[in-house]
Amino acid sequence: MGDPKFHHKKYSTPRHPWEKDRIDEENKILVKYGLKNKREIWRSEAMLSSIRSQARYLRARLRASDANAQKQLERMIKRLSRYKILSDKATLDDVLSLTVENILDRRLQTIVFKKNLALSEKQARQLITHGHITVNGRRVTVPGMLVEAQYEDTIAYYENSPIANELHPIRQALLSPAERVKEEAEKEAAASEDGGEQDE
């Protein structure tokens, strides 16, 4: 088990380090999610492996009509639905069909990008590590944090961050062309109103 005082690896390296198909697949995931290195993939794979291992164990117990197995399955699904990895209506087959991308989709870095708070996955990582992002009002600097569904809507820029200003270049770059046109029109309208008041 090891001494709880010391940190232990939360992942295991591939058994066959030079498999081309696996390397190609990992490289695609690395680029898609803007990950720092493959250890972040392996951590998610270790988590997924643990979930699926528990699900297979529960399936065997359910076949043996174990009364407590159904309750444990419900607790597992409830825990996964809390992180929006599965819905609360999910079944054992849904648990067994999970992929590593289902886990990676719930990382703070991925959600910041999907919420249009960053121009890319890599920029999302940078904003988080530099303290520009808050979750439920608290600054978070861990890109790999799994976000609970109840806190997803609370993800925002830190109020004292320069990026919280809508005129910041990053905020302007995030606007769609239609939003930019609308914003420019509003600025022009406000400027003309100010000019009219001064003339009076």
UniProtKB/Swiss-Prot annotation:
GO cellular component: small ribosomal subunit
CDD domains named among the record's database cross-references: S4 (cd00165)
Biased composition (Basic and acidic residues): 179-190
Start and end residues of each S4 RNA-binding domain: 106-170
Xref: InterPro entries: Ribosomal_uS4, Ribosomal_uS4_arc, Ribosomal_uS4_CS, Ribosomal_uS4_euk/arc, Ribosomal_uS4_N, S4_RNA-bd, S4_RNA-bd_sf
Subunit structure: Part of the 30S ribosomal subunit. Contacts protein S5. The interaction surface between S4 and S5 is involved in control of translational fidelity.
Protein name: Small ribosomal subunit protein uS4
UniProt organism field: Thermoplasma volcanium (strain ATCC 51530 / DSM 4299 / JCM 9571 / NBRC 15438 / GSS1)
Lineage: Archaea, Methanobacteriati, Thermoplasmatota, Thermoplasmata, Thermoplasmatales
